[in-house]
């Protein structure tokens, strides 16, 4: 299963920080790719620097034609839209997990009001709670439930920096630089 996250409606300066956090959360919790619908060099460079230092094969892509992308994706996988107005995550997650054994997943996370068409294109509109909160929180909870907590402490290939969980303080492993 490949998991991609579509960040729909990134609004330049207004969303720089939160969109960066959406991308980093996607990477850290198991997604393989983030797709933005608008270009933002600052966010893209921030994400690429994290991947370079912390490892993994996470991809950052810009796709301006999101409707076409969703329709094409549906040929090989399922589309999950995270929203306050969808099916309860606790009730629908077992079904999504079962289907995802054989199919890829595109998770849609909106930045602004999401067009009605997204609700119609999605195979699943999933609510992560019924109170206003952050799309970063919704994505984190969804990915953690999808992977059943297994991605929280995984090792990333080619990592130059690794954190080792420790109850006694910071344990940081850094790749030695060849001089």
UniProtKB/Swiss-Prot annotation:
One cellular component term from this protein's GO annotations in UniProt: cytoplasm
Protein's job: Specifically catalyzes the AdoMet-dependent 2'-O-ribose methylation of cytidine at position 56 in tRNAs.
Catalysed reactions, as listed in the record: cytidine(56) in tRNA + S-adenosyl-L-methionine = 2'-O-methylcytidine(56) in tRNA + S-adenosyl-L-homocysteine + H(+)
SUPFAM superfamilies per the UniProt record, alphabetical: alpha/beta knot
Cross-referenced NCBIfam families: PRK03958.1
GO biological process terms on file: tRNA nucleoside ribose methylation
HAMAP family, alphabetized: tRNA_methyltr_aTrm56
Superkingdom field: Archaea
Protein's cellular compartments: Cytoplasm
Alphabetical list of CDD domains matching this protein: aTrm56-like (cd18083)
Name of the protein described by the UniProt record: tRNA (cytidine(56)-2'-O)-methyltransferase
Summary of subunit composition and partner proteins: Homodimer.
Residues that, per the record, bind S-adenosyl-L-methionine: 82, 110-114, 128-135
GO molecular function: tRNA (cytidine(56)-2'-O)-methyltransferase activity
Coarse class of the protein's main subcellular location: cytoplasm
EC number: 2.1.1.206
Keywords, alphabetical: Cytoplasm, Methyltransferase, S-adenosyl-L-methionine, Transferase, tRNA processing
Methyltransferase listed as a keyword: yes
Family indicated by similarity: Belongs to the aTrm56 family.
């Amino acid at each position: 299963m490949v998991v991609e996250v579509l960040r729909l409606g990134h609004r330049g300066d207004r969303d720089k920080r939160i969109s960066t956090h959406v991308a980093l959360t996607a990477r850290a919790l198991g997604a393989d790719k983030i797709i933005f619908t608008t270009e933002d060099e600052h966010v893209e460079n921030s994400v690429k620097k994290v991947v370079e230092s912390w490892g993994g094969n996470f991809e950052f892509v810009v796709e301006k034609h999101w409707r076409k992308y969703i329709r094409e994706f549906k040929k090989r996988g399922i589309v999950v839209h995270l929203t306050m107005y969808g099916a309860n995550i606790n009730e629908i997650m077992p079904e999504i997990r079962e289907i995802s054994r054989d199919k890829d997943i595109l998770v849609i996370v909106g930045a602004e009001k999401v067009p009605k068409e997204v609700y119609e294109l999605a195979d699943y509109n999933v609510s992560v709670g019924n109170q206003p909160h952050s799309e970063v929180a919704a994505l984190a909870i969804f990915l953690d439930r999808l992977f059943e907590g297994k991605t929280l402490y995984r090792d990333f290939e080619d990592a130059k920096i690794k954190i080792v969980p420790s109850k006694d303080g910071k344990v940081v492993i850094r790749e030695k630089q060849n001089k």
